A protein has these predicted regions:
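Conserved N-lobe beta3->alphaC-helix segment of eukaryotic protein kinase catalytic domains
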Residues: 10, 15-41
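Conserved N-lobe loop of protein kinases adjacent to the ATP-binding glycine-rich P-loop
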Residues: 2-10
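Conserved short submotifs of the Hanks-type protein kinase catalytic core
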Residues: 57-69, 73
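Protein kinase catalytic-loop region centered on the HRD/HxD motif
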Residues: 94-104
Length: 166
């Protein structure tokens, strides 16, 4: 977390070394993440507040959510009540529905990428693997977190937004 000097506000900051981004062939993914987050305004999607760079690093500044990752709650508590699971499921569904209405496929839905705000609402974060301009089942790239990959991706078939529901 970081603090804005003039206001004292606390934010989360993602710092990427440019040479690391280039070496790992992540330039397009990084640019896509910034482009998407600059334009998305949704209550269940993290907001990009600022983005800047130095000669060696890229910085993306987001609202800070002190509720932590959904993964943490699952790994320490084991499970949610049916009501809480439905509540989170509804918010995730609304976030993905909004992304899909903008022809964005998220491709990395997992508890580690779901943050909780102070009121207990979901915030989808980490758009590094997202893809814009997905109208039909026209995506072929193999990406995502292995434990959460949809069958279409594993089989190296073309796919579309439906993989986000897996």
């Amino acid at each position: 977390q970081v603090r804005k000097k003039d206001s004292g506000e606390i934010f989360a900051m993602k710092v990427l070394k440019k040479d690391h981004v280039v070496r790992r062939n992540q330039v397009e993914h990084t640019m896509t993440e910034r482009r998407i987050l600059e334009n998305i305004k949704h209550p269940f999607v993290v907001s990009l507040r600022y983005a800047f760079q130095t000669t060696q690093k890229l910085y993306m500044v987001f609202d800070f959510f002190n509720g932590g990752e959904l993964f943490h709650y699952l790994s320490t508590g084991g499970r949610f009540s049916p009501e809480r699971a439905m509540f989170y499921g509804a918010e995730i569904t609304m976030a993905l529905g909004h992304l899909h209405s903008l022809n964005i496929v998220y491709r990395d839905l997992k508890p580690e990428n779901l943050l909780l705000d102070a009121e207990g609402h979901i915030k989808v974060t980490d758009f590094g693997l997202s893809k814009q301009g997905v109208v039909d089942d026209n995506v072929k790239s193999f990406c995502g977190t292995p434990e959460y990959l949809a069958p279409e991706i594993l089989k190296r078939e073309t796919y579309g937004k439906v993989v986000d529901w897996w």
